[in-house]
Amino acid sequence: MKTFLFLFAVLFFLDPAKNAFFDEKCSRVNGRCTASCLKNEELVALCQKNLKCCVTVQPCGKSKSNQSDEGSGHMGTWG
């Protein structure tokens, strides 16, 4: 009986720490915890209470951080 009470106490106190870990992981990737992801979002992690951590998918194409190859003299390979 003492073993059961000990295990119950350990699991009871570890549960909030585990849930905080999942929420922290989601905020690190700039996600949001929600019941379901939108069309332009992808599931990247799990949050507490069976919620999903969703992050907006970046659209394909040129981004501000990538430099254009125009004028660089680099010829891309085709095929």
From Swiss-Prot:
Keywords in alphabetical order: Antibiotic, Antimicrobial, Defensin, Disulfide bond, Secreted, Signal
Cellular component terms (Gene Ontology): extracellular region
Tissue expr: Expressed in testis and to a lesser extent in epididymis (caput, corpus and cauda). Also weakly expressed in kidneys and colon.
Keyword 4Fe-4S: no
InterPro entries, A to Z: Beta_defensin_dom
Signal peptide: 1-20
Entry-linked Pfam families: Defensin_beta_2
GO process annotations (BP): defense response to bacterium; innate immune response
Keyword DNA damage: no
Subcellular compartments: Secreted
Cysteines engaged in disulfide bonds, as pairs: 26-53, 33-47, 37-54
Protein family (similarity comment): Belongs to the beta-defensin family.
Role this protein plays: Has antibacterial activity.
Protein name per UniProt: Beta-defensin 15
UniProt lineage: Eukaryota, Metazoa, Chordata, Craniata, Vertebrata
